[in-house]
Amino acid sequence: LLSGRFQPGERLKIRDLAAEWGTSPMPVRAALQRLVAEGALEGEAQRSLRVPAMTRERFEQLLPVRINLEGLAVALAAARISAAELATLQGCVERMQVALRERDVQAYLADNSQFHLVLYQACANPVLLRLIESLWLQVGPFFHRLFTEADLSLRLNDFHSDCLKALQAGDGPAARAAIEQDLQYFGNFLLNLLSLTPPSRARQ
């Protein structure tokens, strides 16, 4: 969900997931029920769950909360981020650039998630991190829309590079501004998609 592997409307069957992960259905069911409580999944009949469809209204509610919480996390992280964490972020930026060039959707989404979450973890505020991860679980499935309908010439990695450079220079306000611009830029793009695209039927 965090990386966007599962898309809005997609049905998840407990037995299938348990088989994929090589475990019994019971722990999978417990984990998925926690995600239902977080609002990241919706329960359905016949032991299946569904990734909620994203509506314009819901996205408009999530976006400003994300911008404020994730911006705060960057501001806190900038003062304490380690050299090892900066190196991890650098690797993410470089791999995202390669993924964009090769049009590798899953690779880009995976490193995009890692970049943001490693950065936010550096804030060392568990309460803030839990809130951010809860929001990411709700919007992650919608990230696929960047690649199914977007022109890959969009500024998909520029804000990450700007944030990294600011962190390396010790400029916390600039790092926060870069992440907030990243969220707002793509938030506006996705809101436009929601305005243009009719709801789709759930994937089987």
Predicted regions mapped to residue ranges:
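Short linear motifs at protein or domain termini
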Residues: 1-79, 84, 191-204
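Short amphipathic alpha-helical interaction/hinge segments
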Residues: 5, 139-143, 147-150, 187-194, ...
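Amphipathic alpha-helical interaction elements
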Residues: 6, 33, 78, 120-124, ...
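Short, flexible turn/loop "capping" segments at secondary-structure junctions
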Residues: 10, 43, 112, 155-157
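Mobile beta-alpha loop/short-helix "lid" or hinge segments that flank ligand
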Residues: 36-42, 135-137, 151-154
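Conserved amphipathic alpha-helical segments that form helical-bundle/coiled-coil interaction surfaces
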Residues: 62, 83-144, 158-166, 174-185
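C-terminal effector-binding regulatory domain of bacterial HTH transcription factors
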Residues: 172-204
